């Protein structure tokens, strides 16, 4: 979710006719996330759209605080080391698309951001804790993951790139990694780790 002070990029697009007007670079505004869950314009100005309804597109990703050079192909990626909670959170990408033709008389416009990437959760358990010590799991990696792509802000569609690498994950009884949504071939080894120095997959 969003925290106080997070910078959110929004495209506020006037709809001048019946045809859908898609976002353009000049529609971009940087917003501040406030304590009450609202968003305010980072430039401190008041922006009014009295004549035409508006549609809204936007995103939040840690470190992205300016308009992308090409909003139809925004480079996105995940780090290959996600061993801390902070690294996990910074790997996320929130996206919103509201094509409801909002009008000025609406006092509140609610935006529902969604997680554009996928979270893989892992849970380890054993029926023989006397012989298998889960605390001795080390070097956990999700292997052969596509780690970069391009996101279309207008549609929310993700085009995967070609960079493939392993993701080093935090080892715990329950933990997760963030990945770009992608198909996993059947019977492919998804992860491996060491248990007491012995490799498992």
Give a label for each model feature.
Residues 1-135, 163-186, 190-201:
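Short, low-hydrophobicity acidic/polar segments
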Residues 143-155:
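Short aromatic-acidic-glycine turn motif
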């Amino acid at each position: 979710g969003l925290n106080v002070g997070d910078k959110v990029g929004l495209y506020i697009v006037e709809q001048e006719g019946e045809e859908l007007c898609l976002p353009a670079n000049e529609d971009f505004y940087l917003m501040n996330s406030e304590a009450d869950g609202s968003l305010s314009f980072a430039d401190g100005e008041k922006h009014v759209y009295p004549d035409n309804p508006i549609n809204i597109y936007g995103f939040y990703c840690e470190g992205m605080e300016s308009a992308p050079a090409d909003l139809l192909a925004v480079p996105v990626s995940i780090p290959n080391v996600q061993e801390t909670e902070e690294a996990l959170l910074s790997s996320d990408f929130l996206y919103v698309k509201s094509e409801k033709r909002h009008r000025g008389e609406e006092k509140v416009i609610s935006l529902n951001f969604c997680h554009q990437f996928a979270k893989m959760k892992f849970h380890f358990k054993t029926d023989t804790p006397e012989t298998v010590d889960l605390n001795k799991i080390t070097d956990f990696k999700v292997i052969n993951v596509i780690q970069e792509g391009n996101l279309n802000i207008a549609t929310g569609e993700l085009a995967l790139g070609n960079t493939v690498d392993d993701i080093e994950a935090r080892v715990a009884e329950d933990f997760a990694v963030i990945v770009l949504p992608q198909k996993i071939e059947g019977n492919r080894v998804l992860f491996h780790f060491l248990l007491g120095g012995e490799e498992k997959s």
